[in-house]
């Protein structure tokens, strides 16, 4: 099999995958009917899981609260990086704006809304306490109050604590604290429980991330989509496990974990609840007709009369920055989803970042990383191009064999192999060097696709966002031209039909890259350009060696 066939098969596989993804979007699989015995939606919008209390043989289903939800009252908390809205009904975070990340290049003054509670799109971070009343679980309603409606972290402050005060009907005084830190997207959420009653209190601490189904991008059947869905980490068992929305619709997750984390992911951004490393929790997922939830429920919490207890968790609302996520919890950085080659992608990103600290431009960083990769594989590429040059020189002899034996494929094949042996040409010599490089190219591809640092990062001229498509589509056209030049340098395929297909590939890939992020297209342009120069140089050098020797021999 020669390199042309490999390229052709890879292109067809990529097209098939894109068409399949488009089909799945337009004709999704039928969703099973939700099992209402597994979960219930409370009147305040919380989904509560199925649990097994210590004194029960069968699971207990939490049922909806009978008390109607009161009108919403939000308090606003603003730091240097976050603008958060907290609903006083249950102390849920229902708004989360990322101040350092504009919505788009055109809307620089509008921060990106990671969390929101709109009718069309809901994505909130809930936390609550609930109890078991016999065999009937109930979510506690504290109707929190706060001293102010607006809190702001001052420039000279390193920390801001927002306290909500509430009281339950059974004599529980609760202070719900939110601790914000300067320059951080991590929020500490603590319940300070004081049992002012005369009997033992026993309950559970519940955290969850709830969002409605995201809208699919149908702008192109070749649209590249990053993973959007839930995930979790169960230390010692699953470092990083995805739970897609379709998985939630089919069955509910039920995992016992010590430490770990739960998360909702989307392209570039992440929300995650991170329990204490020594706490034991049950991770679960639930799905309704509109909403998907991943949550964590603690082991039973007991507070004796006249005693206090603190329970809590940490909530991350922010960008998927590898170095930041590593410091929060083990394996949380894996949500920067580089795929199966994550270890190689991590090395390449570290190299890109090191170059960026010097040049100060992510576009030039992409260019220089591509150059370094080409230099690292120079000898392998040279072997491949030398093999191609040898094959090109054999084309007249191969054509003569085809004309001599006509339709006798067996004789053509035998004569071709004898010719290869006689000329000391390995027809597979151009394939192996290319195959060795493919993992590196794939790893860099995912670095360019997943790194939030490239979001709205400018390059030069009209390219003001390396994570978005070229608005004038100049880069895809240049990329297509480089592919066409590369094909002209390669030996022509023996099969006329294959030759026509190969000539069509530059047009096909131009359309494929039409809406690709500019950073990805830039990488392919630089890579193709360097390949053209290297192939031209090696082919020219190799082709001129033997004629030069013949001239010298004749002169003698």
Swiss-Prot record:
Stretches assigned to coiled coil: none
Protein's cellular compartments: Cell inner membrane
Domain of life: Bacteria
Bilayer-crossing regions: 6-26, 332-352, 358-378, 428-448, 501-521
Membrane topology recorded in Swiss-Prot or TrEMBL: Multi-pass membrane protein
Disulfide cross-links: none
One of the record's GO cellular component terms: plasma membrane
Chief localization: membrane
Keyword Metal-binding among UniProt keywords: no
Keywords: Cell inner membrane, Cell membrane, Chaperone, Membrane, Protein transport, Transmembrane, Transmembrane helix, Transport
A Gene Ontology biological process term: protein insertion into membrane
Keyword Ribonucleoprotein among UniProt keywords: no
Gene3D superfamilies, alphabetized: 2.70.98.90
GO molecular function annotation: membrane insertase activity
Assembly behavior: Interacts with the Sec translocase complex via SecD. Specifically interacts with transmembrane segments of nascent integral membrane proteins during membrane integration.
HAMAP family documented for this protein: YidC_type1
Function field: Required for the insertion and/or proper folding and/or complex formation of integral membrane proteins into the membrane. Involved in integration of membrane proteins that insert both dependently and independently of the Sec translocase complex, as well as at least some lipoproteins. Aids folding of multispanning membrane proteins.
Family: Belongs to the OXA1/ALB3/YidC family. Type 1 subfamily.
Name of this protein: Membrane protein insertase YidC
Organism encoding this protein: Legionella pneumophila (strain Corby)
């Amino acid at each position: 099999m020669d390199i042309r066939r490999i390229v052709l098969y890879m292109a067809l596989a990529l097209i098939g995958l894109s068409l399949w993804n488009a089909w799945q979007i337009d004709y999704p699989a039928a969703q099973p009917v939700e099992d209402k015995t597994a979960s219930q939606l409370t009147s305040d919008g919380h989904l509560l899981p199925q649990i097994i209390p210590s004194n029960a043989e069968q699971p207990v289903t939490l049922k909806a609260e009978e008390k109607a939800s009161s009108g919403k009252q939000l308090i606003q908390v603003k730091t240097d990086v976050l603008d958060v809205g907290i609903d006083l009904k249950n102390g849920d975070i229902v708004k989360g704006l990322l101040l350092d990340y504009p919505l788009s290049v055109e809307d620089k003054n509008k921060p990106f809304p990671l969390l929101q509670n709109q009718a069309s799109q809901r994505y909130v971070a809930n936390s609550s306490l609930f109890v078991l009343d016999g065999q009937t679980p109930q979510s506690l309603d504290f109707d929190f109050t706060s001293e102010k409606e607006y809190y702001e972290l001052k420039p000279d402050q390193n920390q801001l604590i927002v306290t909500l005060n509430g009281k339950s009907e059974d004599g529980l005084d609760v202070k719900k604290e939110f601790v914000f830190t300067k320059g951080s997207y991590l929020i500490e959420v603590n319940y300070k429980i004081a049992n002012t009653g005369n009997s033992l209190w026993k309950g559970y601490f519940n955290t969850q991330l709830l969002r409605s189904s995201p809208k699919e991008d149908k702008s192109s059947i070749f649209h590249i989509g990053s993973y959007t869905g839930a995930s979790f980490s169960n230390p010692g068992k699953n470092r990083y496990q995805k739970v897609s929305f379709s998985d939630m619709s089919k069955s509910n997750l039920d995992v016992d974990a010590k430490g770990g984390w739960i998360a909702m992911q989307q392209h570039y951004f992440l929300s995650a609840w991170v329990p204490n490393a020594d706490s034991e929790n049950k991770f679960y997922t639930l799905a309704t007709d509109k909403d998907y939830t991943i949550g964590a429920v603690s082991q039973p919490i007991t507070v004796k009369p006249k005693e206090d207890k603190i329970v809590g968790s940490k909530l991350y609302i922010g960008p998927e920055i590898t170095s930041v996520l590593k410091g929060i919890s083990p394996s949380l950085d894996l949500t920067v989803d580089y795929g199966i080659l994550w270890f190689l992608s991590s090395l390449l990103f570290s190299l890109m970042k090191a170059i960026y600290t010097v040049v100060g431009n992510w576009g030039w960083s992409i260019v220089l990383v591509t150059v370094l990769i080409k230099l690292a594989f120079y000898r392998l590429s040279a072997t491949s191009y030398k093999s191609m040059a040898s094959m090109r020189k054999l084309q007249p002899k191969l054509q003569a064999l085809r004309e001599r034996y006509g339709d006798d494929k067996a004789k053509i094949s035998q004569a071709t192999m004898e010719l290869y042996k006689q000329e000391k040409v390995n027809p597979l010599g151009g394939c192996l060097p290319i195959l060795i490089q493919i993992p590196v190219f794939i790893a860099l591809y995912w670095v360019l696709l997943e790194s939030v640092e490239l979001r709205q990062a400018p390059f030069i001229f009209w390219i003001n966002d390396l994570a978005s498509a070229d608005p004038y589509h100049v880069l895809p056209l240049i990329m297509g031209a480089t592919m066409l030049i590369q094909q002209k340098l390669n030996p022509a395929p023996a099969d006329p039909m294959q030759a026509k297909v190969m000539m069509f590939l530059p047009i096909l890939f131009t359309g494929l890259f039409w809406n690709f992020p500019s950073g990805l297209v830039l990488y392919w342009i630089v890579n193709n350009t360097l390949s053209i120069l290297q192939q031209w140089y090696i082919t020219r050098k190799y082709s001129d060696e033997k004629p030069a020797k013949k001239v010298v021999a004749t002169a003698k």
